Amino acid sequence: MKSTLRISLKSGERIFINGAVLRVDRKVALEFLNDVTFLLENHVLQPEDANTPLRQLYFIAQMILINPEGKEQTLTMFRKSIVMLLSCFQDDEILAELKRIDAQVVSGRAFDALKAIRGLYPLEDRILNNQEMAPATIEQIRKEIAPWR
């Protein structure tokens, strides 16, 4: 990390830092002086909200940050999901971004990948609302992710 990172948390807010979950009891500012892997509570997707293919991919990717002990298993599931999504989506923008997201995760930049996945939600919503992806394909992806819920 080239510079320090400062974040503010509200009373009762949680943050996931290197796999640990912290809750603050008052408004607080944290300053990270070195490299750290963290995820803010408002970026954590709950299992019941992982109801589309990209949200399911996001859920898997966030587990890399939340549960570092299970990283290898999570990476295996992530790779399997990426391959499946690359074969299911036909939109060039999503396909290019999925390849970039895959490279980010492989290179240890899961936080950047989460941000990129969130950026694809509007495109995914359009595709799903216009039924550009077969319902059977969506169901197949849901079955693959089921063990992670």
UniProtKB/Swiss-Prot annotation:
Keywords: Bacterial flagellum biogenesis, Repressor, RNA-binding. Pfam families: FlbT. GO terms for biological process: bacterial-type flagellum organization; mRNA catabolic process; negative regulation of bacterial-type flagellum assembly. GO terms for molecular function: mRNA 5'-UTR binding. Has a post-transcriptional repressor function in flagellum biogenesis. Associates with the 5'-UTR of fljK mRNA and promotes its degradation. NCBIfam families: PRK00794.1-1. Belongs to the FlbT family. This is Probable flagellum biosynthesis repressor protein FlbT. It comes from Allorhizobium ampelinum (strain ATCC BAA-846 / DSM 112012 / S4).
